[in-house]
Amino acid sequence: MKYEIKIDKPVEGNGHIDLRRLVQLADIISKVAEGALQLRLRGVSITAGRKQAKLDDALRIDLVGVKKGSTRLMLECATLGETLKGIQFDAFRHEGQLQLAEQTPMSLFMNTFSDALDGTSNKEFLDKPLLNQLVAFKKVFRAPEEAFRVSNEGRTKELFVKKESLKQIAVLEESLPEPERIVLQGTVDLLQHSSSRIRVKGPDGVMDGFLSDDLDRSEVARFWTKEATVMGLVHFKPGGRRTIEVQRIFPVEQGEDYFAKQRKGENVEQQIERQLREKGGRNTAKSVVGQWPGDEDFDLLIGQLTA
């Protein structure tokens, strides 16, 4: 696929670009594309685990030329269907999701930016780290009058970005909470065709998520379709959506003492509200099912559950 990045009124002059600016531009585009792909495959754009080597080819974008007429950077990249042969794309299709196999790293970058700037978008494929990368695009500008136009021979709607437009993305990014620790109990289901996407069904609702890279898949397999105690991080997205990054899974019996703290007749969220009121605090993540007040050290909790 062929793409063009046009810099209107570049300070370097038509047909020129400072090599240092080119490096910044390439770095941000690559990070946004990678984050957008990770978010579609796993549920969050950035995880603490190791990066999969097989994603390197999928994220490759080649600079094949520089032309005049302002400054025009000519780029080429392959579709994900060509570069990610082992991915079961059907596992990730649902209402409103883009056909991932037909996407390229550049189209992921363009669509992510467009979603963040579009006031009518449901922003399903955005999260705090990815928005932070978009805000970092301001580093690429050298003057207020500059503008970036990204196009794909008419196949994708042209992306138009000015430095001023990044302010609304910064506001959205700042509105999202940081990830929170979470402990919950429920039935753990593995989503079809996926080795890492899961769904936890508890008494207070359903939460989608994914397994941390540090978890042994064969060890976790014994919990499928069974009640279990799940510990990890919950990541927040625009529109109140959330995803759990599962870091540990235990037999439900090992979580009984922890969950016995609940008062009879209270659901999880009600207990959080009560305990925070007793401590004079406030619930900054009210929508999180199964989250606990936070005074317990996470490593201590793991020790209690594994004792």
Regions inferred by a protein language model and the residue ranges of each:
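Protein-protein interaction interfaces in oligomeric scaffolds
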Residues: 1-166
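Long amphipathic N-terminal alpha/beta scaffold segment
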Residues: 151-153, 171-177, 186
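Short boundary/loop segments of OB/S1/cold-shock single-stranded nucleic-acid-binding domains
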Residues: 161-181, 218-221
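Structural detector for short beta-strands of small beta-barrel domains
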Residues: 178-194
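OB-fold (S1/OB) nucleic-acid-binding surfaces
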Residues: 189-212
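Short nucleic-acid-contacting surface segments enriched for D/E, G, S/T with interspersed K/R
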Residues: 214-231
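OB-fold/S1-family single-stranded nucleic acid-binding modules
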Residues: 235-262
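Short linear interaction segments
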Residues: 270-307
